[in-house]
Amino acid sequence: MDTNEEKLLFRDEVFQIVGCAIEVLNTLGHGIVEKPYENALVVEFGLRKIPFRQQPAFGVLYKGQQVGLFVPDLIAFDSIVVDTKVIGRITDHERGLMLNYLRITGLRVGVILNFEHRKLEWERIVL
C-alpha cells in the first residue's frame, strides 16, 4: 500500500474517534486516571452509534502456541485499536506498543489518545 492510501485508511473513522475523545476531555477535564476516560469513550461511542468492543481478548502466539493474552482498551469500527493514556507525552514507546497491538490483533490502524493535558494529544498509527 502506498503512502497516500495509508493516509486515507479509516481516515473518517479516526476523526470520529478523536471527536469523541475531545468531547470526553472537555467534559471530564484532563489528568485523571485512564479508566474513566476509556469508560467515557464507551458512553460517547454509544451516543454517536460508533460500533465498538471494550476490553476484547486476543491470544499472543509464539510458534503457534498461545503464551498470553493482549486486551486492548477498545476496538472501534471492528478495525481500529484505541488506546487511552494519561502520560506526559506520546513517545516511541507508546508507538512501538501500538505496532505490537496491531500485529497481535491483525488490524491495520490504531489511535493513541493522551488525556494528560488540556488539549488532547493523539496519534494515528498504521501498520
Go through each PLM region and give its residues.
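Short, low-complexity, charge-dense intrinsically disordered segments
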Residues: 1-8
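Conserved catalytic cores of phosphodiester-cleaving nucleases, focusing on short active-site segments
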Residues: 29, 52, 72-90, 101
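A short, glycine/Asx- and small/polar-enriched loop/turn
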Residues: 49, 66-70
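Nucleic-acid nuclease catalytic cores
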Residues: 85-127
